[in-house]
């Protein structure tokens, strides 16, 4: 059939009113009939429907056409459908070309019907010009590595890893912190059922650690990614812990003796308390191992890592406090350790990104007195009310946390003393701090309304006399049982005010003067509060942009990883074989994060399960007889698919089809025109350009 005279069929889709509402279909049909080699022109309401596809199949089977052009919507979503129709009818599917007259024409010129119709003609003419030169191509098959890398050990990463591992596939779970758990581990309870967060999460963390198909790589980060779908090569940097994890039992003896000078803000408690230079991330940590923060360590007694200890006059070694108390020798500083840690290489077939989120820092909001210790973020409030938090769940104002710590030390010594820290009597919540705000983020952070209501409910139930105000722009409760949850909060006596807070002023006694506006009564409101909680925006986690660069995936305008298609492919990325889920993709609550994680896991398993993968032949190929061996193409390839190899005693470029993604950069740059991009050859593209030039659309040099 390749040697036959092209017999082109043009099939024009109405797409309901999406195309027909702006393009005169009958006029376009008459125009298409005049184009060279066009023998059949048909239109249909929805060409992608079964009856629409049947029109194409029937014409192919009856020998009317041997090339197919469909003028419809985007090839991104519909090209596979029409290729399959051609293949089912016995025609090589690469004898198909698509003309996008919806996205590039009708939608772009909805109110200019004459121009839209004329543009549709030109797009179809260019597609027909290319169709005359199409070549039959064959799909390629490559072996797939049946292993998956999951980046991020929060609730989304945990579920993705478990689903894949339970299906019998090897999973590498990489987490940059010493423990998995993510932000969910910091929460006290979860809405709308008020379940204990740790009670839900901890068993899952333990299951991950004990699963035979999961290799847990905590305190590690992805350093580089090479290869392509089915065969990624990933370099992971395991950071130096300065503690022998093979010996560490997680007893915590070392953390108790770390001197005050080495104490720094505790990241897990969101800076409300301090931790030692040697620390275990949190009580339920998995793995529960100590880590030394080398930047905080003061090298007690001049004890440096990798050196023998100094000795006293009587010959006893002078050890650092953590060394002295460690029962297993895990903190032994004599052992030499590489400060760069260890670099390991992994071969995987698919990658799932579940890197989570961070909360926006309060220091951006000068109008809300961010310098006051009693103005905190909602995530800090989670730690304040948690039994594993800095005050063990006792509600006191953050400015008095040092008093609580002193009281705790005295109690530990057996002293009977009362806690003199101030308890808040009035708490004010401020919603949409940084969200829905053109100065910062225009998007809604989705979970803020519900977690403010949750915290207020928990506090009101535990402390009935507590006076709680919540300033909302709008109350958004669009989930299952969410609105009932909101009504329950109102019934408890929590004061919900529709309106914005204009400013907060710090008072000399560390209380806070809150000035807001009540939109329902149309008057300003003033509240003197002991504690203010800011519902700051959910933001992409630190390192998102750098990780996107390493993976070769896109970032959206809001800073989160961008999905391939919002509705059809919400967990896929534009880089095949790499999936996203959870808050890495955008703000969402725990159920939505879990659902998306399971979807990403399912997509990854569908990819690796066959063991082989079909690749399109739309890749570049070098004609070594024409190649001059200049090597210009090698550094230009963004996928590392081109190498220089020996050919007839000379060096020539060679393209690995398994790595090539068909971007065409090499073909465009080759001065010898020795590189051919199948499906987009020089002749095919030039034919399209010349067709448009004849009609006055473009100029050709």
UniProtKB/Swiss-Prot annotation:
Native organism: Archaeoglobus profundus (strain DSM 5631 / JCM 9629 / NBRC 100127 / Av18)
EC number: 1.8.-.-
Gene Ontology molecular function: 4 iron, 4 sulfur cluster binding; metal ion binding; oxidoreductase activity
Main enzyme class: oxidoreductase
Broad class of the protein's primary localization: cytoplasm
PROSITE patterns: 4FE4S_FER_1, 4FE4S_FER_2
Domain 4Fe-4S ferredoxin-type, chain residue ranges per copy: 239-268, 618-647, 651-680
UniProt cofactor(s): [4Fe-4S] cluster; FAD
Purpose of the protein: Has oxidoreductase activity. The Hdl and Mvh subunits may together mediate electron transfer from hydrogen to an unidentified electron acceptor on the cytoplasmic side of the membrane.
Chain positions recorded as FAD binding sites: 152-175
Pfam families, per the entry: FAD_oxidored (PF12831), Fer4_7 (PF12838)
Binding-site residues for [4Fe-4S] cluster 2, renumbered to this chain: 627, 630, 633, 670
Subunit structure: The heterodisulfide reductase is composed of three subunits; HdlA, HdlB and HdlC. It forms a complex with the F420-non-reducing hydrogenase (Mvh), which provides the reducing equivalents to the heterodisulfide reductase.
Keywords (A to Z) from UniProt: 4Fe-4S, Cytoplasm, FAD, Flavoprotein, Iron, Iron-sulfur, Metal-binding, Oxidoreductase, Repeat
Alphabetized PANTHER family for the sequence: COB--COM HETERODISULFIDE REDUCTASE IRON-SULFUR SUBUNIT A, FERREDOXIN:COB-COM HETERODISULFIDE REDUCTASE SUBUNIT A
Protein name as catalogued: Heterodisulfide reductase subunit A-like protein
Residues the entry annotates as binding [4Fe-4S] cluster 3: 637, 660, 663, 666
Domain of life: Archaea
Textual note on the cofactor: Binds 4 [4Fe-4S] clusters per subunit.
């Amino acid at each position: 059939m390749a040697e036959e005279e092209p017999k082109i069929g043009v099939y024009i889709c109405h797409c309901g009113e999406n195309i027909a509402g702006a393009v005169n279909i009958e006029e376009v049909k008459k125009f298409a009939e005049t184009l060279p080699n066009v023998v059949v022109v048909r239109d249909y309401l929805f060409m992608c429907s079964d009856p629409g596809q049947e029109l194409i199949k029937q014409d192919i089977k009856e020998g009317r056409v041997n090339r197919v052009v469909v003028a419809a919507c985007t090839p991104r979503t519909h090209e596979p459908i029409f290729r399959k129709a051609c293949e089912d009818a016995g025609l090589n599917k690469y004898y198909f070309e698509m003309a996008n007259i919806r996205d590039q024409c009708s939608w772009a010129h909805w109110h200019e019907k004459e121009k839209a119709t004329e543009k549709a003609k030109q797009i179809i003419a260019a597609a027909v010009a290319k169709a005359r030169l199409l070549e039959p191509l064959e799909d390629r098959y490559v072996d797939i590595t049946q292993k998956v890398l999951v980046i991020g050990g929060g609730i989304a990463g945990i579920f993705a890893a478990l689903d894949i591992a339970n299906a019998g596939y090897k999973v590498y779970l990489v987490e940059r912190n010493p423990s998995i758990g993510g932000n969910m581990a910091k929460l006290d309870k979860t809405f709308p059922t008020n379940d204990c967060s740790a009670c839900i999460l901890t068993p899952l963390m333990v299951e991950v650690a004990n699963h035979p198909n999961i290799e847990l790589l905590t305190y590690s980060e992805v350093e580089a990614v090479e290869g392509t779908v089915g065969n990624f090569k990933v370099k992971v940097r395991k950071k130096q812990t300065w503690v022998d994890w093979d010996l560490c039992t997680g007893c915590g003896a070392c953390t108790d003796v770390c001197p005050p000078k080495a104490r720094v803000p505790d990241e897990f408690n969101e800076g409300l308390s301090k931790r030692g230079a040697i620390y275990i991330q949190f009580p339920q940590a998995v793995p529960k191992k100590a880590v030394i923060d080398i930047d905080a360590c003061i090298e007690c007694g001049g004890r440096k890592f990798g050196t023998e200890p100094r000795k006293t006059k009587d010959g006893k070694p002078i050890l650092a406090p953590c060394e002295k108390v460690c029962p297993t020798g895990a903190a032994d500083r004599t052992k030499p350790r590489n400060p760069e840690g260890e670099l390991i290489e992994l071969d995987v077939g698919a990658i799932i990104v579940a890197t989570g989120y961070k909360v926006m820092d309060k220091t951006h909001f000068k109008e809300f007195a961010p310098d006051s210790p009693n103005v905190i973020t909602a995530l800090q409030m989670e730690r304040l009310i948690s039994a594993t938090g800095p005050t063990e769940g006792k509600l006191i104002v953050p400015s008095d946390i040092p008093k609580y710590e002193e009281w705790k030390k005295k109690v530990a010594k057996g002293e009977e003393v009362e806690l003199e820290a101030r308890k808040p009597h009035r708490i004010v919540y401020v919603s949409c701090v940084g969200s829905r705000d053109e100065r910062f983020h225009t998007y809604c952070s989705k979970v803020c309304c519900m977690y403010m209501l949750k915290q207020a409910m928990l506090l009101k139930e535990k402390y009935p006399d507590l006076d709680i105000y919540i300033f909302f722009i709008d109350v958004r409760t669009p989930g299952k049982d969410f609105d009932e949850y909101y009504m329950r909060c109102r019934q408890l006596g929590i004061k919900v005010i529709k309106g914005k807070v204009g400013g907060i002023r710090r008072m000399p006694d560390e209380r806070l003067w809150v000035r807001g506006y009540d939109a329902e009564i149309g008057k300003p409101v003033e509240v003197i509060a002991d504690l203010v909680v800011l519902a700051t925006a959910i933001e992409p986690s630190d390192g998102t942009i750098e990780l996107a660069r390493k993976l070769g995936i896109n970032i959206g305008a809001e800073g989160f990883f961008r999905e391939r298609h919002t509705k059809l492919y919400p967990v896929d990325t534009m880089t095949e074989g790499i999936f996203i889920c959870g808050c890495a993709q955008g703000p969402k609550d725990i159920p939505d994060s879990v659902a998306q994680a399971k979807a990403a896991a399912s997509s990854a398993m569908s990819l690796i399960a066959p063991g082989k993968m079909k690749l399109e032949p739309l890749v570049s190929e070098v004609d070594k007889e024409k190649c001059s061996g200049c090597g210009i193409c090698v550094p230009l390839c963004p996928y590392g698919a081109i190498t220089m190899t020996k050919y007839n005693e000379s060096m020539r470029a060679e393209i690995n089809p398994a790595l090539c993604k068909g971007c065409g950069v090499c073909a465009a740059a080759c001065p010898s025109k020795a590189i051919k991009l199948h499906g987009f050859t020089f002749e095919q593209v030039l034919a399209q350009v010349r067709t448009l030039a004849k009609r006055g659309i473009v100029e050709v040099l």
